[in-house]
């Protein structure tokens, strides 16, 4: 990788950063090895009339590289797309740690905090 800093970003289309900030919920198995991060984007740019093409996945990008998932669904309200729900799944502790490093960078860039419910 180059020495330049890559701003942490989420993309539904390659090269186009999503500006809507998602709500993110984490779940983990009892042994802590597997789990999911569920992202919900209300009124994301990716669903605007200006965007064209199909959403085939979500990419989380930062200095370490990219994390990808194809598990992406649209939510509809009155027949119109209103939100995107995407699920990133990890299967090992190291995958979880990598995801958390991305999440911390993304949160810091966007002034977000963490709350336990």
Curated annotation (Swiss-Prot):
Keywords linked to the UniProt accession: Membrane, Photosynthesis, Photosystem II, Thylakoid
Task: Write down the membrane topology.
Answer: Peripheral membrane protein
Query: Organism's domain of life?
Result: Bacteria
The record's annotation in InterPro entries points to:
Psb28_c1_sf, PSII_Psb28_class-1
Q: Which HAMAP family match?
A: PSII_Psb28
> What is a biological process (GO) this protein takes part in?
photosynthesis
Q: Which PANTHER family match?
A: PHOTOSYSTEM II REACTION CENTER PSB28 PROTEIN, CHLOROPLASTIC, PTHR34963
Location of the protein in the cell: Cellular thylakoid membrane
Organism in which the protein naturally occurs: Prochlorococcus marinus (strain MIT 9211)
Does the keyword section mention Thylakoid? Answer: yes
Q: What is the protein's name according to its record?
A: Photosystem II reaction center Psb28 protein
Key word Thylakoid present in the record? yes
Q: How does it assemble?
A: Part of the photosystem II complex.
| Assigned GO CC terms | photosystem II oxygen evolving complex; plasma membrane-derived thylakoid membrane
**Entry similarity comment:** Belongs to the Psb28 family.
């Amino acid at each position: 990788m180059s020495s330049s800093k890559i701003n942490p970003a989420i993309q539904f289309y390659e090269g186009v950063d999503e500006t809507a900030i998602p709500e993110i919920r984490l779940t983990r198995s009892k042994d802590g090895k597997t789990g999911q991060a569920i992202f919900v984007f209300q009124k994301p740019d990716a669903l605007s009339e200006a965007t064209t093409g199909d959403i085939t996945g979500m990419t989380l990008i930062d200095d370490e590289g990219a994390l990808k998932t194809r598990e992406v669904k649209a939510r509809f309200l009155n027949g119109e797309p209103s939100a995107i729900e995407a699920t990133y799944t990890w299967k090992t502790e190291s995958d979880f740690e990598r995801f958390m490093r991305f999440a911390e960078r993304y949160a810091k860039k966007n002034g977000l905090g963490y709350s336990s419910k």
